[in-house]
């Protein structure tokens, strides 16, 4: 299967098996396929987009005054884009709502997170959909975790308002100090929050787990038992404490 930078992929079972490490047999097994959303093929895009982060909304809820619906997509791109005659910047987060739920061939775009308003450039992000405890902090539904312009830290953004006018409730804080005790030697490239216990293939992910990818190889990740990761590997953080200089996982 071939794809472009504007297409979304999904990773599913191969021959009935969907396996992840480190659970035996400790070999990642599955198949990539196209997920049915192609930003390049939409009539109102410029045909040359590069998606660098995406989240599928899994339930109806309101975040920072914006009513989100199950199946909505939150998207950021690696460069500035013009979609439907509207200019978006790298670091903005776009909201795509399909015209027909589950059919991503047509829909509408709007601005969900305006980087200019809050002086934060989202290079990786995950939106909490439920209240969940991460380490020693309780996150609320609607809290946004993000990396600012290729950072090794994960910030917590608490909203007063999302949308074309984005307003923070207080100053965004460092939730995960990646280049402190965790020893990240590379920037974070992707991020996801598990806000309810989830079974994927042969792995159970407890609520509060963070899934992270780095942009390059790093042989010493973690404050306890360290692991080595290669470029674009996904690994989990089971966080015990948060904050600058005090993050452990």
Residue spans for each PLM region:
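Sequence/structural signature of beta-propeller domains
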Residues: 1-249
